[in-house]
């Protein structure tokens, strides 16, 4: 509701809940002109049986992910020192959500993922991201190697993350355009 109110369709709140957070959500919905409804507990159990919803659900419009062309069109908006995160074959939705949450906190300008062999942008991903995905520029590409080559052609320094490495990302000198590539949960970085 705060980060991307245009994506919100309807806020559902459980009947009987009255607390400061509940009132804050109603205020946010009103400020953003998002419709809201109160529903019985049974509605929540049927609508979201596998989600710990805490009596609150937000129905959103589908989010369209950018592609290679969109990345190239938006490139100049990132300024002189863009920070790009490239996620190669992150298949676990919770891991993807955690990566997006961290990327948002780190000030990443764009997150690039392959179209195949990656977790889709699901409710689990978005919940794990805790709002961190809402204002990130998310890009899905057909060919990660080609996209990396294009980034290098734009002067981007491409680094690969290593679980056994000794340098922590926030202590390295990353002046200038930088892209950090993170590999899959099980195999790490693949040869691109």
Language model region names:
Residues 1, 91-98, 143:
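Amphipathic alpha-helical repeat scaffolds
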Residues 1-73:
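N-terminal positively charged helical leader segments and presequences
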Residues 21, 118-124, 188-192:
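Short, glycine/polar-rich helix-capping loops at beta-to-alpha or helix-loop-helix junctions
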Residues 84-94, 113-114:
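Short, glycine-rich nucleotide/cofactor-binding loops
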Residues 109-167:
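Histidine/lysine/aspartate-rich catalytic loop segments that bind and position anionic ligands
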Residues 159-192:
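Active-site/ligand-binding-proximal alpha/beta "capping" segment
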